[in-house]
């Protein structure tokens, strides 16, 4: 009888511990990259996930868009996104979801051509939408969710 009670108590304790582990809130960690802007965080880590803020194609050194139109902005967006993900302990190849915001859906095919070159394997899940306007009149903005390395 003692053995049965001990087994029951042990199983109950394990069950309570497991439920606590799955329902306990994860700690949130803010990732700091570049000069602070005070308006939003470049990325937030919760558990094993990294959530980035949207990245536009501003060169962080000059504060300007690179010359060269849509392709140049796209390439700078991915440089910025890569920098934020790497500062978070992740990387582009660990992205699981991306949301692409385009100022003009006529850039969709060009974006797809450039986008597929960014990944070694299967690309992450993705949503692409056209928006009325982006900050600083950017042509593209990308936000991502990634897992830690």
What spans do the regions from the language model cover?
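Surface-exposed aromatic
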Residues: 96-98
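N-terminal presequence-like segments and the immediate start of the first folded domain
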Residues: 4-8, 16-79, 83-93, 102-149
């Amino acid at each position: 009888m003692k053995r049965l009670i001990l087994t029951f108590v042990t199983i109950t304790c394990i069950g309570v511990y497991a439920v606590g582990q799955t329902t306990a809130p994860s700690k949130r960690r803010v990732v700091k990259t570049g000069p602070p802007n005070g308006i939003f965080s470049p990325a937030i880590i919760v558990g094993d996930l990294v959530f980035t803020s949207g990245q536009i194609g501003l060169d962080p050194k000059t504060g300007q868009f690179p010359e060269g139109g849509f392709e140049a902005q796209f390439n700078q967006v991915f440089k910025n996104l890569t920098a934020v993900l790497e500062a978070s302990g992740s990387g582009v190849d660990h992205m699981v979801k991306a949301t692409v915001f385009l100022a003009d859906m006529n850039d969709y095919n060009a974006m797809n051509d450039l986008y597929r070159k960014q990944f070694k394997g299967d690309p992450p899940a993705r949503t692409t939408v056209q928006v009325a306007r982006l900050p600083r009149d950017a042509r593209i903005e990308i936000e991502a969710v990634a897992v830690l390395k």
